[in-house]
Amino acid sequence: MAKRFGYSFQNFDPKRMARASARDLRISPKLAVEVCRELRGMMLNDALRYLDDVIALKRPVPLKRYNDSQGHKPGKGFGPGRYPVKVAKAIKKVLLNVKNNAVQKGLDPDKLKIIHIAAHKGPVLRGWYPRAFGRATPFNEQTTHIEVVVEEIRR
């Protein structure tokens, strides 16, 4: 039986690491890339708190790549940013999933560090709006794949 999908992360060690992924999420791939960049390298519990603050509109996500026509957010030295609530909720589910996978393996959830998190474009869901005079306007919805790998840090 063929594998349905893989991970872009190489050298996965099942004894020290846990991973999770979500496929075909109906979230923006551009904002997902920005949130993943911000979470990469964080401790897992800190990342969950950060996402809670984004969902509560307390902390914005800085936009480094996809920031054309974005206003600056409050805070000293803070440039373009947004509060991507839908993306934060989806990524939070994946982080909780990887945390549960790590606990199931016997890893300590307080020592988990996000060593890999990535957002990839998924398939486009195509649709049509009927318009006047027999025309139709396309509406396409982007989907996103998220993958996370955490590692237990020895202190």
Swiss-Prot record:
Keywords: Ribonucleoprotein, Ribosomal protein, RNA-binding, rRNA-binding. GO terms for biological process: cytoplasmic translation. Coiled coil: none annotated. The keyword Ribonucleoprotein applies. Disulfide bonds: none annotated. This protein binds specifically to 23S rRNA. It makes multiple contacts with different domains of the 23S rRNA in the assembled 50S subunit and ribosome. The globular domain of the protein is located near the polypeptide exit tunnel on the outside of the subunit, while an extended beta-hairpin is found that lines the wall of the exit tunnel in the center of the 70S ribosome. This is Large ribosomal subunit protein uL22. The lineage of its organism: Archaea, Methanobacteriati, Methanobacteriota, Thermococci, Thermococcales. The gene is rpl22.
